[in-house]
């Protein structure tokens, strides 16, 4: 992957401009920062970690170590180094780590090693909050277990239940599922039982509970055998997650690789740019030209804006694809596949893409719309600068976003610099972007009409189990 393009960061206070371009002075973000030039880096984790070990040092057998090498895993990540030796001790485990920390291999490797020792069908079950994450976890299991011909089945909503029943009838070693569809099969698929299950993993447990899967998890836990090993992985330890671990784990060991709730990695270059709201599109196009040839995720707040920006960028010749919860399952998987393969290098997304998705090679994150909370900001920018690589995150701050931005900086524990660019260079693009905006408006009308037709056809009502494993954004 090419190195992220280096940019100079402005030390001067940003000049605010109103939508009306008036000459009256405005209070700047930098003036509220007070001593921006002397701002210190955010708090570091108080824990000191030893030098990374090899997977063999952790107790992983040679066959699986070779699979790790094939996948490009040079050394264990902190969560892997802490979790794997404990998981191999046949103990329940709670792992607290942020997105992009390598949690999947932290539970997949011990399960595969145990499977090699005592092969059987329905050996492990992994519960995930979203369909995309379920498919990615399955792919990781299959890649790491390729030398032992591990069989995985993905059981998620939005897919044909009959074909899933056939897949379960082939007795896979590992099932990766969303809770709603798994419970459907446990209740309705003849001959399907998990009474011999040995391992249960609840990945992104905080997200599972945020998406109201709690009652479904309770039902599933009552069906599963008590004599099993359970791994719970989460980015945070909320009261809901605490309750879940008490109900599902037996005398667990706990691993945490970060003591700072809002910590970001040191290889991530974060900045903001104050932008008049009406000029956001122009600045976005300018920055994409600055980072041409590099992969980028553009985060927006709504489905409508995600689609509009995708249409806008396509009209300008960019390879942009949307990702949000109102797309069909096949469209969402297709979008992720194109972005991973780099046939498209720009992903325009709601927060459906902020957590859990396996997109390892993102160079730039652009917060077109600021998130309303600091935790979501950290999850978004965590899509870049992963596994020791460098990355860039730039946030657009309009005259309406100043208070939100100051709250985010407060949570980070540091003041960020303004991204340096020349306004005159940006505004050269105004006419061209304006034409693309008009074209995008026409395409949005067609999109909204089709969406309205579907809404009338299917009606509105309480979410089904199938819909629950689809992100809201």
Swiss-Prot record:
GO terms for cellular component: cytosol; nucleus. Residues 1-10, 453-463 have a biased composition (Basic residues). ATP binds at residues 97-104. A motif (Q motif) lies at residues 53-81. ATP-dependent rRNA helicase required for pre-ribosomal RNA processing. Involved in the maturation of the 35S-pre-rRNA and to its cleavage to mature 18S rRNA. PROSITE patterns: DEAD_ATP_HELICASE (PS00039), HELICASE_ATP_BIND_1 (PS51192), HELICASE_CTER (PS51194), Q_MOTIF (PS51195). This is ATP-dependent rRNA helicase rrp3. Interacts with the SSU processome. A motif (DEAD box) lies at residues 203-206. CDD domains: DEADc_DDX47, SF2_C_DEAD.
